[in-house]
Curated annotation (Swiss-Prot):
Gene it is expressed from: Adcy8
Lineage of producing organism: Eukaryota, Metazoa, Chordata, Craniata, Vertebrata
Protein known as: Adenylate cyclase type 8
GO cellular component, one term: apical plasma membrane
Reported regulation of activity: At rest, the N- and C-terminal domains interact, as part of a larger autoinhibitory complex, with calmodulin pre-associated at the N-terminal domain. Upon a calcium rise, calmodulin becomes calcium-saturated and subsequently binds to the C-terminal domain. Fully calcium-saturated calmodulin then leaves the N-terminal domain, binding solely to the C-terminal domain, and the whole autoinhibitory complex dissociates, resulting in activation of adenylate cyclase.
InterPro entries: A/G_cyclase, A/G_cyclase_CS, AC_N, Adcy, Adcy_conserved_dom, Nucleotide_cyclase
Catalytic activity: ATP = 3',5'-cyclic AMP + diphosphate
Site entry (Essential for CALM1 interaction), positions: 1203, 1205
Length: 1249
């Protein structure tokens, strides 16, 4: 760092920094453990499902730090942003500087809209970096001007958006209403005090006109207070402004009355000062209005003083002194009003940013929920949470490869396969093929919902679903048959529209299933059982265009459908081997009128179309796009779904249209305003009188927060000192030299304070001075010392001059006339100016916005005590002489008593103003703390979403959905010319699997399968297999692909990924052997590998699924199904590539491959034996840590949910609380009504023995 660059780092900046959350077990590779991925997501699902309580309105790498306290500007010191940092919510715009070194706008317009977020490495999907919050220049019309860090007022301190300005005015409406009431009450109490004193002390009765005016003005102020209080729910900002104008008019009229001799406070200069201070600091007037009002009041008083002089000792210097006095109060008032309003606007923006962060957090919650539900049905998540929520043993969440399986009886399983799809895929482009599949399966999903079926999975062109899961249904077989009939009608309509020979082959069987999720990667909900295998074989042994059912399904149909013999044994070896009787549903004689409603609409209009395309969705219905409801738009607030709108606090938007962006934020702010009106945060976190936080740690962080307007406050205090000097110079002491020395010293001392606090903005100053400046600005105690020193200097400037009054040469007390008094300009002739300048010193306390209000009160009391001591004892004669000279006998209250009353009024006004500012600043601080917590949670949620998205899509595909402009509404599809495809099955697992009491109806068999798949998944975590993507598991078959990354398609080593796939196949055989040793089994893998061109894409909107299609996929599958257990079979084309890469093969011969040999004849195949020589580029195996089964993930999140619940119960009435204390844990997590799980015969949560 250069010596000229001094960065002031606040000790409290960590409060505004998104703290890193070190991933457990991270080895530096950038991988994050998966066991906490579902924590907030499932909590959100649970809360959405069961919690309807009232919601309050109220990471890795080095983060960019920024402190921006209430009333502060963005000219803070920010350290350099590292390359791996995450932008905080409160940050400078890209075009803003940490320090302004010249006369510039406080909020300069940003030069660009780019983000400063660093790169997240090669695996970053691009949505972990928080969106940079808009800078203040995006909100303000004119944020003021600054020079060397000192902010100067502007008259147009308002927001650009009218809606935002309206919300801001409403946000602080209650505070301003209260300030006006307090000001009027204070004025009324002053009048009543004077009235009581007059009745008690005055020797003569009160002038009737004076009494009438007193009662009239008191009545006006009482009526104003009553109207403002009574109409508080209906009071608008404009109405409040007009009431403020009426209050000012009433006070100014009293000044006029005092000038005419009908006031209770002498000539009324002190009351003018109070009126000016109240106009700027307590009345709800815009700054422009306040300036006009202040100038009008000042001009009125000066005019009256000149035209109707009421003092015996009078001079032009005294008039000039008044002018300077009023100028000083107006200048201080402008600074106070502007900086106070600016502080409130900053607090409002922080509230808005907090609301925006909360809205983004809810959006992330909704994305998380959709991601979870795209993998797992809601009933499974809720049942798992319900069963695991009482598990308190911490070590259970770390147990190895847990599974969670449900068993359901009395269900029907439907398998459907598109006949002719392979030939169709060769005639369509990648985009057309994926679009067709998406539209076709979207219709099937819609039909499944109508017929009460649950879609399980899509396997290429195969679709299968289950009825009776999760809700039990007596007509589950009927639902599947109706589903099959609708599918056949749909595919026939497709065939008629596309002119392609496609049809459906459907098989249905009834029985029981086990359902759940296996493995560590690419989670997909699936079903397993003997009955699932039968349904699959019924499909493969069926007839295109017909529904092939078993005897079990026929028995469930109760004769409601006409059937005929299916002869499935003749077409399928499995059916023949197990002697399964089959039947075919007779196709009903129906026309297109019985098609699904949306297709009927299309068929009616299709005859009118002259140019029909290849798709079949030209009607009124169109399928949703995959992930359209999950990722939303990049860098914008995702629109809330109508279902998710109910999640907003207090169901804010139940009756509203779905909105997004600023409109939704503004709606939420309105709700926040309603909550804020109850002062919940103040009662819960802030002590009533001192306004200190009840939490000592919060108080410490708040006290260490940088005060960005401290320099401006100090400059304003220095200006006040200059005005005090000017006033007392116009009315000099008889001892001119001591006074000159006094003010010279005070000005130099104050100049030194200003210099030492602004030195950081002057690079020409010594480095040690600038570092001292940084330390002062960042240290609470040092700032307070400077503040007290400034107040003391101003106070000494106001009071010390009284020491130079010479009683020996004082003016004569008798026989003075107005004409002869013009020569007397000694300040001792006007002792009340000692009080007026003392009032200016008191106003100096109000200038320092961040000074604690209790400390202000203490300082003000000390000032009044010193003045009382001087006026009542040492210099009482000076005031008595002045009263004898200028006041008539009717004046019951002397100058010194009136002065103390005036100071008491200022004490109450300044203290209340300080309390309001401090409350605003502390409330702003609480909002920031809350926003920071929610942003950290949002960051963690986004990390969870990224990892979950990785479990659904390859990284480059995930980036497509997150970075691409989603307005184009294009499906994701990609053609690849050189990829490797592998299928690895366990042929012996079907014989091993059995549903008996001994193995818990097949659960123990699936437990072992889970261990096998999990071991396979862990192999993919090794660096050498980073080019391989798991696609899915199909029963006991494992499917993986290499070369899908666009980089691999363009690299020089075109088939390096294929070699990695072959190495992976060899590693799988070693892994299964290791499993056999520990499980006492003798499983063997049967693996098939092929390479070539494929089409990849994402289909399905509700359950998006990434898949690949093409001849290469079919050939790899046939290499597996026609292979030999314990061997790896490849076709000749793959053999020719791998043999040159150091692999050894054994020639098998020519085999018949269904679906391919019909056109190309028999296929030459080879068995992969291994590597002849090791690959020198293969690094030693290195496992990435932190992979756990789905059950371990959910178990961990449940225990975390319980811990969070305890924390939230502590804040049950807090704005940020979303869980009420009265709910019972069991009630919260137990499904209500006829929920799923009633049909589950047993669930498994135990571990592998």
């Amino acid at each position: 760092m250069e010596l000229s660059d001094v960065h002031c780092l606040s000790g409290s900046e960590e409060l505004y920094t998104i703290q890193p959350t070190p991933p457990a077990g991270d080895d530096g590779s950038g991988s994050r453990p998966q066991r906490l991925l579902w924590q907030t997501a499932v909590r959100h699902i649970t809360e959405q499902r069961f919690i309807h309580g009232h919601r309050g309105g109220g990471g890795g790498g080095v983060s960019r730090k920024a402190s921006n306290p209430a009333g502060s500007g963005p000219n803070h010191h920010a350290p350099q942003l590292s390359s791996d940092s995450v932008l905080p919510l409160y940050s400078l715009g890209p075009g803003e500087r940490a320090h302004n070194t010249g006369g510039t706008k406080v909020f300069p317009e940003r030069s660009g809209s780019g983000s400063a977020s660093g790169s997240g490495g090669g695996g970053d999907l691009g949505f972990l970096h928080l969106d940079c919050a808009p800078s203040n220049s995006d909100f303000f019309l004119n944020g003021g001007y600054s020079y060397r860090g000192v902010i100067f007022p502007t008259l147009r301190n308002s927001f650009k958006s009218r809606d935002l300005e309206r919300l801001y005015q409403r946000y602080f409406l209650g505070q301003r209403r209260k300030s006006e009431v307090v000001m009027n009450v204070l004025d009324v109490l002053t009048k009543l005090t004077l009235l009581v004193l007059h009745l008690s002390l005055a020797s003569a009765p009160m002038d009737p006109l004076k009494g009438i005016l007193l009662g009239f003005f008191t009545g006006i102020e009482v009526v104003i207070c009553a109207l403002v209080v009574v109409r508080k729910d209906n009071t608008s900002h404009t109405y409040l402004q007009y009431s403020g104008v009426v209050t000012w008019v009433a006070m100014t009229t009293q000044i006029l009355a005092a000038g005419l001799g009908y006031g209770l406070l002498g000539d009324g200069i002190g009351y003018v000062l109070f009126t000016l201070f109240a106009t700027y600091s307590m009345l709800p007037l815009p700054l422009t209005w306040a300036i006009l009002a202040g100038l009008g009041t000042s001009l009125l008083q000066v005019t009256l003083q000149v035209l109707i002089p009421r003092l015996a000792v009078f001079s032009i210097n005294q008039v000039l002194a008044q002018v300077v006095l009023f100028m000083c109060m107006n200048t201080a008032g402008i600074f106070i009003s502007y900086l106070s309003d600016r502080a409130q606007r900053q607090a409002f923006l922080e509230t808005r940013r907090c609301v925006e962060a909360r809205l983004r957090l809810e959006t992330e919650n909704q994305r998380q929920e959709r991601l979870v539900l795209s993998v797992l049905p809601r009933f499974v998540v809720l049942e798992m949470i319900n069963d695991m929520t009482n598990v308190e043993d911490e070590h259970l969440q770390h147990q190895f490869h847990r599974i969670y399986i449900h068993r359901y009886e009395n269900v029907s399983i439907l398998f459907a396969d598109v006949k002719g799809f392979t030939n169709l895929s060769t005639t369509l482009s990648a985009q057309e093929l994926v679009r067709m599949l998406n539209e076709l399966f979207a219709r099937f999903d819609r039909l499944a919902h109508e017929h009460h079926c649950l879609r399980i999975k899509i396997l290429g062109d195969c679709y299968y679903c289950v009825s009776g899961l999760p809700e039990p249904r007596r007509d589950h077989a009927h639902c599947c048959v109706e589903m099959g009939l609708s599918m056949i009608k749909t595919i026939r309509f497709v065939r008629s529209r596309t002119k392609h020979d496609v049809d459906m082959r459907i098989g249905i069987h009834s029985g029981s299933v086990l359902c759940g999720v296996l493995g560590l990667r690419k989670w997909q909900f699936d079903v397993w059982s003997w009955d699932v295998d039968i349904a699959n074989k019924l499909e493969s042994g069926g007839i295109p265009g017909r529904i092939h059912i078993s005897k079990a399904t026929l028995d469930c149909l109760n004769g409601d459908y006409n059937v005929e013999e299916g002869h499935g044994k003749e077409r399928n070896e499995f059916l023949r081997k197990h002697n399964i009787e089959t039947y075919l549903i007779k196709q009903p004689e129906e026309s297109l009128l019985c098609l699904p409603e949306d297709i009927v609409k299309e068929s009616v209009s299709c005859s009118d179309r002259r140019n029909s395309g290849a798709t079949f969705t030209e009607g009124s219905w169109s399928p949703e796009l995959p992930f359209d409801n999950i990722v939303g738009k990049q860098n914008t607030l995702a629109a809330l779904t109508r279902n998710s709108i109910n999640l907003l606090p207090n169901h804010l938007a139940q009756a509203l249209h779905v909105q997004s962006g600023p409109e939704e934020i503004n709606k939420r702010i309105e709700h926040t305003i309603d909550l804020r009106s109850g002062d919940k945060l103040r009662r819960e976190h802030i002590k009533p009188f001192s306004l200190m936080f009840k939490d000592s740690s919060l108080e410490h962080k708040y006290s260490q927060m940088r005060d960005e307007v401290f320099k401006s406050n100090l400059v304003c205090a220095f200006i006040v000192l200059l005005f005090i000097t000017a006033i007392q110079s116009l009315l000099p002491s008889s001892r001119l030299m001591p006074m000159t020395i006094q003010f010279s010293i005070l000005i130099m001392l104050h100049s030194a304070l200003v210099l030492i606090t602004t030195a950081e903005d002057y690079k020409c100053l010594p480095l040690i001075l600038r570092k001292t400046c940084c330390w002062i600005n960042e240290t609470y105690l040092a700032r307070n010392v400077i503040i007290f020193a400034s107040i003391l200097i101003n106070f000494l400037g106001a009071v010390l001059n009284i020491l130079w009054c010479d009683f020996d040469k004082s003016i004569p007390l008798k026989n003075l006339t107005f004409n002869s008094s013009a020569v007397f300009t000694d300040i001792c002739s006007y002792p009340e100016y000692f009080v007026f300048t003392g009032v200016l010193a008191m106003v100096t306390c109000a200038v320092f916005l961040r000074l604690n209000s209790v400390l202000k009160l203490a300082v003000l009391l000390i000032m009044i005590a010193i003045y009382a001591l001087l006026t009542e004892t040492i210099y009482a004669g000076l005031f008595l002489s002045y009263d004898n000279l200028n006041h008539s006998g009717e004046d019951f209250l002397g100058t010194k008593e009136a002065s103390l009353l005036l100071m008491a009024m200022f004490l109450l006004a300044v203290f209340y103003h300080g309390q309001q500012l401090e409350y605003t600043a502390r409330l702003d601080f609480l909002w920031r703390v809350q926003a920071k917590e929610e942003i950290n949670e949002m960051k963690e949620l986004r990390e969870h979403n990224e990892n979950m998205l990785r479990n659904i899509l390859p990284s480059h595909v995930a980036r497509h959905f997150l970075e691409k402009d989603r307005d184009n509404e294009e499906l994701y599809s990609q053609s690849y010319d050189a990829v490797g495809v592998m299928f690895a099955s366990i042929p012996g697992f079907a014989d091993f699997y059995s549903q008996t009491e001994m193995n818990n109806q097949g659960v123990e068999c699936l437990r072992l399968l889970n261990e096998i798949i999990a071991d396979f998944d862990e192999l993919l975590g090794e660096d050498r297999f980073q080019d391989i993507e798991k696609i899915k598991t199909i029963g006991s078959t494992y499917m993986a692909v290499s070369g899908l990354s666009p980089e691999k398609q363009q690299c020089e080593d075109k088939w390096g990924h294929l070699c990695a796939l072959a190495d992976f196949s060899l590693a799988l055989t070693e892994s299964i052997q290791e499993i056999n040793k520990h499980s006492f089994n003798n499983f063997e893998l049967r693996i098939g590998i092929s390479h070539g061109s494929v089409v990849a894409g994402v289909i399905g909107a509700k359950k998006p699924q990434y898949d690949i299609w093409g001849k290469t996929v079919n050939l790899a599958s046939r290499m597996d199904s026609t292979g030999v257990s314990g061997r790896i079979q490849v076709p000749e084309e793959t053999y020719l590539i791998l043999k040159d890469q150091g692999f050894a093969f054994d020639y098998r011969g020519e085999i018949y491959v269904k679906g391919i040999s019909e056109q190309e004849g028999k296929i030459k195949t080879y068995f992969l034996l291994g590597r002849v020589q090791p690959n020198p580029f293969i690094l030693p195996p290195r496992r990435l840590p932190g992979q756990y089964s789905l059950a371990a993930v959910v178990l961990g999140l449940v225990q975390s949910l319980n811990r969070q619940r305890q924390k939230q119960l502590l804040n049950e009435n807090s704005n940020s609380g979303i869980i009420k204390s009265h709910y019972n844990r069991r009630t919260l997590l137990t499904p209500s009504g006829p929920e799923p799980g009633a049909q589950a015969e047993g669930t498994d949560k135990s571990d592998l023995p």
